């Protein structure tokens, strides 16, 4: 049997992968916390930044809610919102990539997995990109990379700090090398931004993995994370099989990374806006000259 025949036979016999089920969050009026089981009135949950008041569990939120939580009301100005991905490789696995894109666009109302623009946090200007895990797992394709790169370049020209809210499964395999190229492209734009002594803050949310972790998620001047966020490159099972040893229970969590020096601060979502405003203000102030 040839290698190609072996792969063809494996496709026929391999069991379909089951997607990880989303937590049961109710029918729109009530939401059940997957951590403590508390049933909460959804309006109260949203008013608390989608954080469980009983146990502090951070529910997954979409890009629109993230912008509402972080920015001053009415201050957001979208950038490059018209960019849409194509299918340059005519990629098809169990389904055509073009079909997956159409489904994600219809279900989320987004063109791709990131929303970019400028706004203000307590009156201070900022350029920000918010990744949305609902769109193909927040995967980074050519359009995601292009939008983030353009945003950073705009911020460099306008002397603005940059905030990227990361929520991604990594590079988008359906775009092959075009997806992997975005890691270097975004990193290059960040280096030019850094050379102008401008502030860059990545906010790592659950989950941040793969090529996003291996590039712009870990290049910040200050690296922030939400509590208990999953942050890593390869999956836990792959690492355990490679090392042939059991990993700690809290491995690849925000707390584990902070203990090992990879995350500067873990900030609850309810405090993010005020803490970011303080950081922006401190960065804008000239360094004090001691007498």
Curated annotation (Swiss-Prot):
Residues 29-291 form the CoA carboxyltransferase N-terminal domain. This is Acetyl-coenzyme A carboxylase carboxyl transferase subunit beta. One of its GO terms (molecular function) is zinc ion binding. Zn(2+) binds at residues 33, 36, 52, 55. Binds 1 zinc ion per subunit. NCBIfam families: accD. Component of the acetyl coenzyme A carboxylase (ACC) complex. Biotin carboxylase (BC) catalyzes the carboxylation of biotin on its carrier protein (BCCP) and then the CO(2) group is transferred by the transcarboxylase to acetyl-CoA to form malonyl-CoA. It is found in: Cytoplasm. The keyword Cytoplasm applies. GO terms for biological process: fatty acid biosynthetic process; malonyl-CoA biosynthetic process. It comes from the Bacteria. It catalyses: N(6)-carboxybiotinyl-L-lysyl-[protein] + acetyl-CoA = N(6)-biotinyl-L-lysyl-[protein] + malonyl-CoA. It is an enzyme of class 2 (transferase).
């Amino acid at each position: 049997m040839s290698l190609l025949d072996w792969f063809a036979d494996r496709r026929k016999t391999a069991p379909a992968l089951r997607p990880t089920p989303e937590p049961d969050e109710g029918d729109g009026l009530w939401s059940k916390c997957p951590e403590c089981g508390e049933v909460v009135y959804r309006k109260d949950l949203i008013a608390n930044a989608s954080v469980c008041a009983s146990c502090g569990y951070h529910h997954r939120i979409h890009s629109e809610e993230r912008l509402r939580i972080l920015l001053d009301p009415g201050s957001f100005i979208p950038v490059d919102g018209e960019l849409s991905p194509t299918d340059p490789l005519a990629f098809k696995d169990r389904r055509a990539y073009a079909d997956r894109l159409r489904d994600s666009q219809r279900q989320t109302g987004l063109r791709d997995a990131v929303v970019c623009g400028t706004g203000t946090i307590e009156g201070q200007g900022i350029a920000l990109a918010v990744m949305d895990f609902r769109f193909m797992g927040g995967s980074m394709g050519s359009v995601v990379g292009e939008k983030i790169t353009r945003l950073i370049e705009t911020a460099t020209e306008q002397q603005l700090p940059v905030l990227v809210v990361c929520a991604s499964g990594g590079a988008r395999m359906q775009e092959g090398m075009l997806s992997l190229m975005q890691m270097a492209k975004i990193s290059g734009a960040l280096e030019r931004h850094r050379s102008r002594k401008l502030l860059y803050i990545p906010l790592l949310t659950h989950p941040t993995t793969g090529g996003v972790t291996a590039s712009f998620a870990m290049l910040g001047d200050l690296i922030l994370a939400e509590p208990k966020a999953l942050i890593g490159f390869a999956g836990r099972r792959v690492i355990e099989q490679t090392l042939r040893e059991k990993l700690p229970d809290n491995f690849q969590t925000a707390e584990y990374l902070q203990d090992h020096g990879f995350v500067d601060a873990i900030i609850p979502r309810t405090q993010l806006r005020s803490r970011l405003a303080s950081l922006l203000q401190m960065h804008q102030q000239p360094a004090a000259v001691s007498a």
